[in-house]
Regions:
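Catalytic cores of DNA base-excision repair glycosylases
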Residues: 2-208
Length: 208
C-alpha cells in the first residue's frame, strides 16, 4: 500500500486498541491548568507531572494566582520534573501574559499560543487538539516520532518536520487523533526498549 493508505490503516488499527484515547495528564479542571500540565510534561512522564500538579493547583489554581507567585515556591513544587527551573519561570511568565492579555484563559489559536513562554508547536497543538479537537496541527513528541519513523511515514528526525509530514498524510479532520493514538501506542506497545510484539499492528509494514 502507498504511504497515505498505510497512514490511514495504521491509525484505524491503533484506534481499535485505544478507542477512547485521551491525555493521561490529571489534576486539571480548566484550560489554563491543562496548558500548565502540558508545559511541565516536556521531557517528563505524565506520571511525574501528575505528582506535582495536585499541590501546584491546590495552591495556585488560576493564572491570576500563579502570575504573582514566588519563583522559589514554584521551583520547589515542580522540582521533581526535568528542567524544573526553566519550566517554573515559563509558567509564571505565561500566567502573567494570560492574565494581562486574555483574562487568564489561553487563546484557541495555534499562532497566539506559541507567543507564550515555553509553548511551542507541539505544546500548542496538544492543548488545542485534546481540549477542542481544533485540528490546527499535529503534535509530535518522542512516541509519535518513533511510531512515524518505524512505519516509514517519515524519514525526518526533527519533530516539526515530522509534524508537517504527517499533516500531509492525514486529512485535517483526523489531525487531533494522531498524537493521542500514536502516544499511547508508542508508550505501551511500540516501546523504545522492547516492543510488545504480540500487540504490534501491521508488522509487515515496519521499516525500522
Amino acid at each position: 500500500m502507498n504511504k497515505k493508505e498505510l497512514a490511514k490503516q495504521l491509525l484505524l488499527e491503533i484506534e481499535k486498541i485505544y478507542p477512547d484515547a485521551s491525555t493521561e495528564l490529571k489534576n486539571w479542571k480548566t484550560p489554563f491548568q491543562f496548558l500548565v500540565c502540558i508545559m511541565l510534561s516536556a521531557q517528563t512522564t505524565d506520571k511525574q507531572v501528575n505528582k506535582v500538579t495536585k499541590k501546584l493547583f491546590g495552591k495556585y489554581p488560576d493564572a491570576k494566582s500563579l502570575s504573582i507567585a514566588d519563583i522559589d515556591d514554584i521551583t520547589n513544587i515542580v522540582k521533581s520534573v526535568n528542567y524544573f527551573k526553566t519550566k517554573a519561570k515559563h509558567i509564571i511568565k505565561t500566567a502573567k501574559l494570560l492574565q494581562n492579555n486574555y483574562n487568564g484563559v489561553p487563546p484557541k489559536d495555534v499562532v497566539e499560543l506559541q507567543k507564550l513562554p515555553g509553548v511551542g508547536y507541539k505544546t500548542a497543538n496538544v492543548f488545542l487538539n485534546d481540549l477542542y479537537k481544533s485540528n490546527q496541527g499535529i503534535a509530535v513528541d518522542t512516541h509519535v516520532v518513533r511510531v512515524a519513523r518505524t512505519y516509514g511515514l517519515t524519514k525526518n528526525v526533527n519533530p516539526t518536520k515530522i509534524a508537517h509530514d504527517l499533516e500531509k498524510l492525514y486529512p485535517k479532520r483526523d489531525w487531533y487523533k494522531v498524537n493521542a493514538l500514536f502516544v499511547l501506542y508508542g508508550r505501551y506497545i511500540l516501546k523504545a526498549k522492547k516492543r510488545i510484539e504480540e500487540k504490534v499492528v501491521l508488522k509487515e509494514e515496519i521499516v525500522l
